[in-house]
């Protein structure tokens, strides 16, 4: 471990639980810190807080009392979902209490090298692809971070023979100071989470934190399909390795249906195990990382050919009487849904869309939804999505929730069609997260098959 005594006997406040906060609290306690956990959920409805209390960790629940910070804390570790304009965080910063996220703790204790993956779309798929390729090559890629496995929890069990393959959100990267991956990937940068960050430039700045401590000995893998990525190359000390589906670059690229790395064919694009142009980009990013880690082409090809995707990201669910169901609940913005649709024939797609309206420009979807067989629209953003459907000339019906939407979509579909849940919106108007929304879609498909 990089630190042994750094936290010993230090008073640390963990703000917000969920998976990452719970993991951070246990790790800090293990490292000898004097831990206090503060979570807004009432104690009686808070199994994580109950469990931590049983382990001897102090917990304060049901709100975030500012007077708690009258104690002399040496450090605050915050849940990444809590914004920096939260009064507790503002007071901590005013008192010059360092505020970190759990990812920083993972870096500080990790004996394993770290590959960090961030971006607006494609993070989970690319992270999973990289992890599977490295593991197939004997390099033990351990998935962690925003992908569902708390980074600090995985870091505790990782050795120097493993590699931490870490999916990182902009929320997590806002709280890093010393974090230093040996390879970082930025899949793409699109306007999203503006309600959290305030502006696109602030969002990009948060993502860009991934490379702050990198040097010329480290590698930064960037998507040269985007001019923004090209512009950012002059602002890093890291060695930039580009990937692109649009041009030949000094890295990974697509040419005549083949995926190359620096002039050498690795595999054919149509051999990738999951559909869609976006997955070609994800595969190219993966190839760049794999080649930087000296993985042979055959291992890369075999792994990516067998790759079955990830849950909630263009996940094939089932086939009922010739109608195929795909769960793309993780598509919480316009670009993700555009890329999902690119893998299908619109005339055979019944699209389920809508959810929490976070200021998306739904007119951008009009060219992509033109020609759809039908749409099923739901959620807070329904009126704006319906206006986009009208402009595209697509007929639609409305639904009250995901179960209702799934049933109506199936009624509208015929043999050979696809029912695609790709909402282009966050889930929080109806559901706790996109996973809950996707699981309800899967459950309803199972009921339809009975």
From Swiss-Prot:
GO annotation (BP), single: regulation of cell shape
Principal cellular location given in the protein's record: cytoplasm
UniProt EC number: 6.3.2.9
Gene Ontology cellular component list: cytoplasm
Keywords linked to the UniProt accession: ATP-binding, Cell cycle, Cell division, Cell shape, Cell wall biogenesis/degradation, Cytoplasm, Ligase, Nucleotide-binding, Peptidoglycan synthesis
Catalytic activity: UDP-N-acetyl-alpha-D-muramoyl-L-alanine + D-glutamate + ATP = UDP-N-acetyl-alpha-D-muramoyl-L-alanyl-D-glutamate + ADP + phosphate + H(+)
Pathway linked to the protein: Cell wall biogenesis; peptidoglycan biosynthesis
InterPro entries referenced in this protein's UniProt entry, alphabetically: Mur-like_cat_sf, Mur_ligase_C, Mur_ligase_C_dom_sf, Mur_ligase_cen, MurD
Record's keyword annotation contains Cytoplasm: yes
Intracellular or extracellular location(s): Cytoplasm
Gene Ontology MF terms in the entry: ATP binding; UDP-N-acetylmuramoylalanine-D-glutamate ligase activity
Positions that bind ATP: 119-125
SUPFAM superfamilies, per the entry: MurCD N-terminal domain, MurD-like peptide ligases, catalytic domain, MurD-like peptide ligases, peptide-binding domain
Entry-linked HAMAP family: MurD (MF_00639)
Family (UniProt): Belongs to the MurCDEF family.
NCBIfam families xref list: murD
Protein task: Cell wall formation. Catalyzes the addition of glutamate to the nucleotide precursor UDP-N-acetylmuramoyl-L-alanine (UMA).
Name of protein: UDP-N-acetylmuramoylalanine--D-glutamate ligase
Organism of this sequence: Streptococcus pneumoniae serotype 2 (strain D39 / NCTC 7466)
């Amino acid at each position: 471990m990089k630190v042994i005594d750094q936290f010993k006997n230090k008073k640390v406040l963990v703000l917000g639980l969920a998976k990452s906060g719970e993991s951070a609290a246990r790790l800090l306690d293990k490292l000898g810190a004097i831990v206090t956990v503060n979570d807004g959920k009432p104690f009686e409805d808070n199994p994580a807080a109950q469990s931590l209390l049983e382990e001897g960790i102090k917990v304060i629940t049901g709100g975030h009392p500012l007077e708690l910070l009258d104690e002399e804390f040496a450090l605050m570790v915050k849940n990444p979902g809590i914004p920096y304009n939260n009064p507790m965080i503002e007071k901590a910063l005013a008192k010059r209490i360092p505020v970190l996220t759990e990812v920083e703790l993972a870096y500080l204790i990790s004996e394993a090298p770290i590959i960090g993956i961030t971006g607006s779309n494609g993070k989970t798929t690319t992270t999973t692809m990289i992890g599977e390729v490295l593991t197939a090559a004997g390099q033990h890629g351990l998935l962690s971070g925003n992908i569902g496995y708390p980074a600090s929890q995985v870091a505790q069990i990782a050795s120097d023979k493993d590699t931490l393959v870490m999916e990182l959100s902009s929320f997590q990267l806002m709280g890093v100071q010393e974090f230093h991956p040996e390879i970082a990937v930025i899949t793409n940068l699109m306007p999203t989470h503006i309600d959290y960050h305030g502006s696109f430039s602030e969002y990009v700045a948060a993502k860009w934190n991934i490379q702050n401590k990198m040097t010329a000995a480290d590698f930064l893998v960037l998507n040269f399909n985007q001019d923004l990525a090209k512009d950012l190359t002059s602002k890093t000390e890291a060695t930039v390795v580009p990937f692109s589906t649009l041009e030949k670059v000094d890295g990974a690229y697509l040419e005549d249906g083949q995926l190359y790395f620096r002039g050498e064919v690795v595999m054919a694009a149509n051999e990738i195990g999951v559909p869609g142009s976006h997955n070609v980009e994800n595969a190219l990013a993966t190839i760049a990382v794999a080649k930087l880690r000296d993985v042979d082409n055959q291992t890369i090809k075999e792994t990516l050919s067998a790759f079955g995707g990830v849950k909630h990201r263009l996940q094939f669910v089932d086939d009922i009487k010739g109608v195929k169901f795909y769960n793309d609940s993780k598509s919480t913005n316009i670009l993700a849904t555009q890329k999902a649709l690119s893998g299908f024939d619109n005339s055979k797609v019944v699209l389920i869309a809508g959810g929490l309206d976070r200021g998306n420009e739904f007119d951008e979807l009009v060219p992509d939804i033109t020609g759809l067989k039908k749409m099923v629209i739901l959620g807070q953003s329904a009126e704006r999505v319906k206006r986009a459907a009208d402009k595209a000339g697509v007929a639609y019906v409305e639904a009250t929730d995901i179960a209702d939407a799934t049933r109506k979509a199936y009624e509208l579909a015929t043999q050979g069609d696809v029912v695609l849940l790709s909402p282009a919106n966050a889930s929080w108007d109806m559901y706790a997260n996109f996973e809950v929304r996707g699981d309800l879609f899967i459950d309803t498909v199972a009921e339809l098959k009975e």
